[in-house]
Curated annotation (Swiss-Prot):
Pfam entry (one): Sod_Cu
Taxonomic lineage of the native organism: Eukaryota, Metazoa, Ecdysozoa, Arthropoda, Hexapoda
Annotated protein name in UniProt: Superoxide dismutase [Cu-Zn]
Annotated disulfide bonds: C56-C145
Principal location class: cytoplasm
Species, as recorded: Drosophila erecta (Fruit fly)
Protein backbone atom coordinates (compact mmCIF):
# COMPACT_ATOMS: atom_id res chain seq x y z
CA UNK A 1 0.00 0.00 0.00
CA UNK A 2 1.54 3.31 -1.10
CA UNK A 3 1.61 6.09 1.49
CA UNK A 4 2.12 9.72 0.50
CA UNK A 5 2.73 12.78 2.65
CA UNK A 6 3.27 16.48 2.03
CA UNK A 7 4.92 19.34 3.90
CA UNK A 8 4.38 23.05 3.20
CA UNK A 9 7.45 24.94 4.41
CA UNK A 10 7.04 28.48 5.71
CA UNK A 11 9.45 31.06 7.13
CA UNK A 12 12.30 32.84 5.35
CA UNK A 13 12.54 29.65 3.28
CA UNK A 14 9.29 28.56 1.61
CA UNK A 15 8.35 25.52 -0.41
CA UNK A 16 6.58 22.20 -0.71
CA UNK A 17 8.10 18.79 -0.11
CA UNK A 18 6.47 15.46 -0.98
CA UNK A 19 7.14 12.04 0.54
CA UNK A 20 6.21 8.69 -1.00
CA UNK A 21 6.77 5.13 0.20
CA UNK A 22 5.56 2.01 -1.64
CA UNK A 23 5.62 -0.25 1.46
CA UNK A 24 7.21 -0.41 4.90
CA UNK A 25 10.12 -2.32 3.33
CA UNK A 26 11.02 0.25 0.65
CA UNK A 27 12.89 3.60 0.82
CA UNK A 28 11.06 6.91 1.10
CA UNK A 29 11.32 9.19 -1.94
CA UNK A 30 11.50 12.86 -0.97
CA UNK A 31 10.97 15.49 -3.67
CA UNK A 32 10.02 19.12 -3.89
CA UNK A 33 11.19 22.70 -4.16
CA UNK A 34 12.29 25.36 -1.67
CA UNK A 35 12.80 29.09 -2.32
CA UNK A 36 14.48 31.81 -0.28
CA UNK A 37 17.80 30.02 0.26
CA UNK A 38 21.27 31.57 0.07
CA UNK A 39 23.68 29.94 -2.38
CA UNK A 40 25.17 27.14 -0.22
CA UNK A 41 24.33 23.83 1.41
CA UNK A 42 21.46 23.85 3.91
CA UNK A 43 20.79 21.26 6.59
CA UNK A 44 17.52 19.42 5.93
CA UNK A 45 16.07 17.43 8.80
CA UNK A 46 12.92 15.90 10.25
CA UNK A 47 12.42 17.20 13.79
CA UNK A 48 10.58 15.40 16.58
CA UNK A 49 7.40 17.42 17.02
CA UNK A 50 4.71 18.62 14.63
CA UNK A 51 4.45 21.80 16.68
CA UNK A 52 5.11 25.13 14.99
CA UNK A 53 3.33 27.32 17.58
CA UNK A 54 6.60 29.16 18.29
CA UNK A 55 7.82 29.01 14.72
CA UNK A 56 10.40 26.35 13.91
CA UNK A 57 11.83 26.40 17.45
CA UNK A 58 8.88 24.44 18.89
CA UNK A 59 9.56 21.50 16.56
CA UNK A 60 12.11 20.17 19.06
CA UNK A 61 15.32 18.29 18.26
CA UNK A 62 15.99 16.01 15.30
CA UNK A 63 13.68 12.98 15.26
CA UNK A 64 15.79 10.39 17.09
CA UNK A 65 13.66 7.60 18.62
CA UNK A 66 16.63 5.23 18.93
CA UNK A 67 18.98 7.58 20.83
CA UNK A 68 21.77 7.73 18.24
CA UNK A 69 24.32 10.46 17.47
CA UNK A 70 23.88 12.88 14.60
CA UNK A 71 25.29 11.62 11.31
CA UNK A 72 25.11 11.54 7.53
CA UNK A 73 22.18 9.91 5.71
CA UNK A 74 24.45 6.98 4.76
CA UNK A 75 25.66 6.39 8.33
CA UNK A 76 24.31 3.51 10.39
CA UNK A 77 24.66 5.65 13.53
CA UNK A 78 22.39 8.63 12.81
CA UNK A 79 19.14 10.22 13.90
CA UNK A 80 16.20 9.02 11.81
CA UNK A 81 15.59 12.67 10.93
CA UNK A 82 19.08 13.25 9.52
CA UNK A 83 18.49 13.83 5.80
CA UNK A 84 21.74 15.68 5.13
CA UNK A 85 21.82 18.83 3.00
CA UNK A 86 20.06 20.39 0.07
CA UNK A 87 22.17 22.52 -2.27
CA UNK A 88 20.90 25.96 -3.23
CA UNK A 89 22.43 27.40 -6.38
CA UNK A 90 21.11 30.88 -5.68
CA UNK A 91 18.25 30.46 -8.13
CA UNK A 92 14.72 29.82 -6.94
CA UNK A 93 13.58 27.13 -6.60
CA UNK A 94 16.09 24.76 -5.02
CA UNK A 95 15.17 21.20 -5.96
CA UNK A 96 14.85 18.56 -3.25
CA UNK A 97 15.51 14.98 -4.35
CA UNK A 98 16.37 12.44 -1.66
CA UNK A 99 15.84 8.70 -1.36
CA UNK A 100 16.23 7.49 2.23
CA UNK A 101 16.04 3.98 3.65
CA UNK A 102 15.87 4.94 7.35
CA UNK A 103 12.83 7.22 7.54
CA UNK A 104 9.39 5.68 7.14
CA UNK A 105 5.78 6.69 6.62
CA UNK A 106 4.63 3.50 8.39
CA UNK A 107 4.36 2.44 12.03
CA UNK A 108 5.64 3.86 15.30
CA UNK A 109 8.67 5.56 13.70
CA UNK A 110 6.61 7.31 11.01
CA UNK A 111 7.64 10.87 10.22
CA UNK A 112 4.01 11.87 9.51
CA UNK A 113 2.97 14.51 12.03
CA UNK A 114 6.56 15.66 12.59
CA UNK A 115 8.28 18.78 11.18
CA UNK A 116 10.70 19.29 8.29
CA UNK A 117 13.22 22.02 9.11
CA UNK A 118 15.49 23.80 6.63
CA UNK A 119 18.58 25.31 8.26
CA UNK A 120 20.62 28.40 7.35
CA UNK A 121 23.94 26.57 7.13
CA UNK A 122 25.40 23.29 5.94
CA UNK A 123 25.00 20.18 8.09
CA UNK A 124 28.52 18.91 8.86
CA UNK A 125 27.04 15.39 9.09
CA UNK A 126 28.41 14.91 12.61
CA UNK A 127 32.00 15.11 11.39
CA UNK A 128 32.85 18.79 11.90
CA UNK A 129 34.42 18.66 15.36
CA UNK A 130 32.18 21.50 16.60
CA UNK A 131 30.44 21.01 19.97
CA UNK A 132 27.10 20.81 18.08
CA UNK A 133 28.31 18.39 15.38
CA UNK A 134 27.06 15.25 17.14
CA UNK A 135 23.64 16.73 18.01
CA UNK A 136 22.62 19.11 15.21
CA UNK A 137 25.36 18.95 12.59
CA UNK A 138 26.06 22.59 13.48
CA UNK A 139 23.57 23.54 10.75
CA UNK A 140 22.65 26.93 12.19
CA UNK A 141 19.34 28.74 12.46
CA UNK A 142 16.00 27.24 11.48
CA UNK A 143 14.91 29.33 8.49
CA UNK A 144 11.88 27.37 7.30
CA UNK A 145 9.68 24.55 8.52
CA UNK A 146 6.37 22.77 8.14
CA UNK A 147 4.46 19.80 9.52
CA UNK A 148 4.39 16.61 7.45
CA UNK A 149 0.78 15.62 6.75
CA UNK A 150 -0.91 12.68 5.07
CA UNK A 151 -1.53 13.27 1.36
CA UNK A 152 -4.09 11.76 -0.99
CA UNK A 153 -2.79 8.68 -2.78
Amino acid sequence: MVVKAVCVINGDAKGTVFFEQESSETPVKVSGEVCGLAKCLHGFHVHEFGDNTNGCMSSGPHFNPHGKEHGAPVDENRHLGDLGNIEATGDCPTKVSITDSKITLFGADSIIGRTVVVHADADDLGKGGHELSKSTGNAGARIGCGVIGIAKV
